[in-house]
């Protein structure tokens, strides 16, 4: 029989170990990263957890951006929100008005962790900052710009220079016709049509998408994307669609799969699609800048970001917020932010991550990997090309999708579709404006 004092000591040790295990603070993190991107999110969380045994980040895929935002807000209303919610860029105004969030600069301040907001690339951080205080409301994470992916092997077969992607939309239309004639099922397809064909088309060509500097200067903004330049662009795509040179394959990122499986020779898609293209494409491909309108004065201007940021939700305890601050600080460290950028194709969110990536020779070894960054920094942004801050923007994107689909199916002219999209979208803007003043 073991001595009593030994048994008591063992019991005390066991209880202490149990207490330590129970002291681990679990931090739910809801996101929209799937495929290779989801694997990278899991990898970052696992590494943080290993380095910080008192905390456990639990990443959970909750569907696409719209589904995740809806799930997060619904969970907040029932008191079951995650600690961290990934929300796409057009959900920024909605999150600001939701009263469901705790600004990240407050989270860091209360946790006693130094937070250098100036470390983030200004054109990215400006999108997620409080326009009154200049402080970050959410932390940039997977920021992107649209880029052009093209099949170099298909270019060769069609008699096109594989090192020269089309620079203008007029060039792209010509290339798509030649690629289709050479035997490709699809010359060109586009992902995220509202973000690329209207929001970024407008910024890249120096045009406003909405008044009040795209909503940054007030909730009384009105949509302005039904002007002659945008109508002409959609009309060009309509003509390509009729000829079979442009294929509409879906509202989200469906065109990326059509590209990497070899169906479509070119696609405009998020720079964040690069991870899946690297993984699945079985041909030589290139990454080019977004085309611009050859008739646009002073184009190209600058791209506006897409992707998402990380919002901290209200209603958590102090220890949870301390863990959240530590995790966000971990993500922003140069080596981690650089790794995320290099593995996914998303933008380097900090200056240090960009510098480190360049010093490591990544851009020299991977031509085109800096395309998204060069587009974002192509020219200093104009007041109306730094992004969008429009209420109910996720719903407005759905309206834009519906109206553009009416063009691709021949039910409306480009002018009719964009006029209707502006009219319907403005109704949502007025509803949002009213809600912020009530």
UniProtKB/Swiss-Prot annotation:
<dbReference type="Pfam" id="PF13416">
    <property type="entry name" value="SBP_bac_8"/>
</dbReference>
<keyword id="KW-0574">Periplasm</keyword>
<dbReference type="GO" id="GO:0001407">
    <property type="term" value="P:glycerophosphodiester transmembrane transport"/>
</dbReference>
<dbReference type="InterPro" id="IPR050490">
    <property type="entry name" value="Bact_solute-bd_prot1"/>
</dbReference>
<keyword id="KW-0143">Chaperone</keyword>
<feature type="binding site">
    <location>
        <position position="346"/>
    </location>
    <ligand>
        <name>sn-glycerol 3-phosphate</name>
    </ligand>
</feature>
<feature type="binding site">
    <location>
        <position position="270"/>
    </location>
    <ligand>
        <name>sn-glycerol 3-phosphate</name>
    </ligand>
</feature>
<comment type="similarity">
    <text>Belongs to the bacterial solute-binding protein 1 family.</text>
</comment>
<feature type="binding site">
    <location>
        <position position="144"/>
    </location>
    <ligand>
        <name>sn-glycerol 3-phosphate</name>
    </ligand>
</feature>
<feature type="binding site">
    <location>
        <position position="89"/>
    </location>
    <ligand>
        <name>sn-glycerol 3-phosphate</name>
    </ligand>
</feature>
<keyword id="KW-0732">Signal</keyword>
<dbReference type="GO" id="GO:0015794">
    <property type="term" value="P:glycerol-3-phosphate transmembrane transport"/>
</dbReference>
<protein>
    <recommendedName>
        <fullName>sn-glycerol-3-phosphate-binding periplasmic protein UgpB</fullName>
    </recommendedName>
</protein>
<comment type="subunit">
    <text>The complex is composed of two ATP-binding proteins (UgpC), two transmembrane proteins (UgpA and UgpE) and a solute-binding protein (UgpB).</text>
</comment>
<dbReference type="GO" id="GO:1902517">
    <property type="term" value="C:glycerol-3-phosphate-transporting ATPase complex"/>
</dbReference>
<dbReference type="GO" id="GO:0030288">
    <property type="term" value="C:outer membrane-bounded periplasmic space"/>
</dbReference>
<dbReference type="InterPro" id="IPR006059">
    <property type="entry name" value="SBP"/>
</dbReference>
<feature type="binding site">
    <location>
        <position position="397"/>
    </location>
    <ligand>
        <name>sn-glycerol 3-phosphate</name>
    </ligand>
</feature>
<dbReference type="InterPro" id="IPR006061">
    <property type="entry name" value="SBP_1_CS"/>
</dbReference>
<comment type="function">
    <text>In the absence of G3P, UgpB can serve as a potent molecular chaperone that exhibits anti-aggregation activity against bile salt-induced protein aggregation. The substrate G3P, which is known to accumulate in the later compartments of the digestive system, triggers a functional switch between UgpB's activity as a molecular chaperone and its activity as a G3P transporter. Chaperone and G3P binding activities are likely mutually exclusive activities.</text>
</comment>
<keyword id="KW-0813">Transport</keyword>
<feature type="binding site">
    <location>
        <position position="65"/>
    </location>
    <ligand>
        <name>sn-glycerol 3-phosphate</name>
    </ligand>
</feature>
<feature type="signal peptide">
    <location>
        <begin position="1"/>
        <end position="23"/>
    </location>
</feature>
<comment type="function">
    <text>Part of the ABC transporter complex UgpBAEC involved in sn-glycerol-3-phosphate (G3P) import. Can also transport glycerophosphoryl diesters, which are hydrolyzed to G3P and alcohol during transport. The G3P moiety can be detected in the cytoplasm whereas the corresponding alcohol is usually found in the culture medium. Binds G3P and glycerophosphocholine, but not glycerol-2-phosphate.</text>
</comment>
<dbReference type="GO" id="GO:0016020">
    <property type="term" value="C:membrane"/>
</dbReference>
<feature type="binding site">
    <location>
        <position position="307"/>
    </location>
    <ligand>
        <name>sn-glycerol 3-phosphate</name>
    </ligand>
</feature>
């Amino acid at each position: 029989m073991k001595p009593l004092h030994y048994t008591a000591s063992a019991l005390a040790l066991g209880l202490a170990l149990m207490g330590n295990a129970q002291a681990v603070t679990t931090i739910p993190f809801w996101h929209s990263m799937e495929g290779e991107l989801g694997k990278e999110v899991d990898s970052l969380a696992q590494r943080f957890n290993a380095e910080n045994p008192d905390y456990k980040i639990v990443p959970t895929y909750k569907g696409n951006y719209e589904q995740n935002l809806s799930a997060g807000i619904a969970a907040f209303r029932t008191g079951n929100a995650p600690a961290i919610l990934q929300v796409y860029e057009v959900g920024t105004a909605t999150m600001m008005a939701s009263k469901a969030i705790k600004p990240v600069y407050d989270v860091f301040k209360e946790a006693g962790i130094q937070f250098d907001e100036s470390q983030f690339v200004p054109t990215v951080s400006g999108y997620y900052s409080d326009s009154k205080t200049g402080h970050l409301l959410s932390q940039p994470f997977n920021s992107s710009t649209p880029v052009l992916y093209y099949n170099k092997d298909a270019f060769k077969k069609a008699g096109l220079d594989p090192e020269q992607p089309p620079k203008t939309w007029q060039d792209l239309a010509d290339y798509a016709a030649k690629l289709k004639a050479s035997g490709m099922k699809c010359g060109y397809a586009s992902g995220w049509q509202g973000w690329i064909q209207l929001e970024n088309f407008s910024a890249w060509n120096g045009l406003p998408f909405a008044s009040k500097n795209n909503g940054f200067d007030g909730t009384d903004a009105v949509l302005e994307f039904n002007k002659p330049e945008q109508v002409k662009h959609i009309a060009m795509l309509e003509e390509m669609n009729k000829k079979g040179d442009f294929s509409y394959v879906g509202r989200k990122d469906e065109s990326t799969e059509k590209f990497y499986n070899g169906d479509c020779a070119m696609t405009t898609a998020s720079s964040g699609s690069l991870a899946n293209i690297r993984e699945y494409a079985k041909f030589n491909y290139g990454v080019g800048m977004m085309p611009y309108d050859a008739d646009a004065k002073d184009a190209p201007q600058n791209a506006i970001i897409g992707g998402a940021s990380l919002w901290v939700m209200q209603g958590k305890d102090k220890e949870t917020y301390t863990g959240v601050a530590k995790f966000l600080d971990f993500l922003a460290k140069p080596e981690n932010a650089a790794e995320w950028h290099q593995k996914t194709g998303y933008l380097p969110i900090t200056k240090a991550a960009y510098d480190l990536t360049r010093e490591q020779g990544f851009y020299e070894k991977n031509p085109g990997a800096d395309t998204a960054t060069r587009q974002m920094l192509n020219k200093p942004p104009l007041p109306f090309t730094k992004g969008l801050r429009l209420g109910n923007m996720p719903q407005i994107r759905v309206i834009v999708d519906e109206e553009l689909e009416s063009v691709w199916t021949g039910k409306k002219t480009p002018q009719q579709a964009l006029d209707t999209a502006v009219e319907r979208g403005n109704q949502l803007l007025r509803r949002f404006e009213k809600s912020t003043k009530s």
